[in-house]
């Protein structure tokens, strides 16, 4: 009888397990192909890393179906303007490659301000990257915000 292959936990899963924060591990690529039946595209959030002119790096988390308002994020984060960190500098800044940025891992390594669009708070949960491409977590929005010291705000266009 063949052994059932067990999916290896990501570092984000391990951190959340150690902190006893309830979450579901998911394996799919939200930007490509079919989604699992129980996953709505609007519940998947992207983690965007930007540079503020006053604060330095700042993280904005919005649904993949929406666009981030740089103007709103700048205002809420105490900057005059923010701009996306160039992809070539992303891993050096956050520790993650494009598509694997996640609030849990970033908070463990850096003290960057993190802002989550208020739509996640209204929905009650969100799906974000688990630190590896093709791996995600479904987590209670407030639990995530509390754990990574994030603030909910209106940051989408």
PLM region spans:
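Extended, low-hydrophobicity, polar/charged segments
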Residues: 1-157
